[in-house]
Amino acid sequence: MGQVFLLMPVLLVSCFLGQGAAMENQRLFNIAVNRVQHLHLLAQKMFNDFEGTLLPDERRQLNKIFLLDFCNSDSIVSPIDKQETQKSSVLKLLHISFRLIESWEYPSQTLTISNSLMVRNSNQISEKLSDLKVGINLLIKGSQDGVLSLDDNDSQHLPPYGNYYQNLGGDGNVRRNYELLACFKKDMHKVETYLTVAKCRKYLEANCTL
């Protein structure tokens, strides 16, 4: 009987520690989702502002080219539709989100558009991407109970954006900026979707449908 009473405080402490870790993990999820939502909105605004500087014919032509082209980050394997996203594990969605954010750390520094607001935004974006990458890595560690973490050996190395755009013609700067902004907007929407679904699945929220 005495041993039972001695074990009770230990069990209570373990229970409280477990609850504390779960609450901290949920807090990190909320922060990550809020940050990527902000990045997505910022990417949408930058893209819309840039489109507003183009002539209608130029905008239509660039949109046609972009629909036939692909983004540098498309080499990262990710769900192809809503159904596949819903079926993916929380850990898989976190890993893909990490890769997508990581793929934009360097390109985000090259959004040098001749607009002071956009240049300030590009600097702000680089910082937010780095913070979000750290946050997602913490979520991955929490989901794996700290057994594994993402390191350099586990990274998918993407081709540099400089090579990706080196064959563009005389209007390369305009097309390059258009595609960078369009791809950034697309990828931030992906990460927002994946983190939202992962959070919903992790904490069994009422409606996880897309």
Curated annotation (Swiss-Prot):
Q: Give the main localization category.
A: secreted
Q: Name one GO molecular function term.
A: growth hormone receptor binding
**Which compartments does it reside in?**
Secreted
Which segment of the chain is annotated as a signal peptide? 1-22
Give the GO cellular component terms, alphabetically.
cytosol; extracellular space
Q: Which of this chain's residues are annotated to bind Zn(2+)?
A: H38, E192
Q: Which pairs of positions does the record mark as disulfide bonds?
A: C71-C183, C200-C208
Which terms under GO biological process does the entry name? animal organ development; calcium ion homeostasis; chloride ion homeostasis; growth hormone receptor signaling pathway; hyperosmotic salinity response; magnesium ion homeostasis; negative regulation of testosterone secretion; positive regulation of gene expression
Q: Which Pfam families match?
A: Hormone_1
Alphabetized UniProt keyword annotations: Disulfide bond, Hormone, Metal-binding, Secreted, Signal, Zinc
Cite the InterPro entries for this sequence: 4_helix_cytokine-like_core, Somatotropin, Somatotropin/Prolactin, Somatotropin_CS
To which protein family does this belong? Belongs to the somatotropin/prolactin family.
Function (record text): Growth hormone plays an important role in growth control and is involved in the regulation of several anabolic processes. Implicated as an osmoregulatory substance important for seawater adaptation.
Spell out the protein name for this chain: Somatotropin-2
Gene coding for it:
gh2
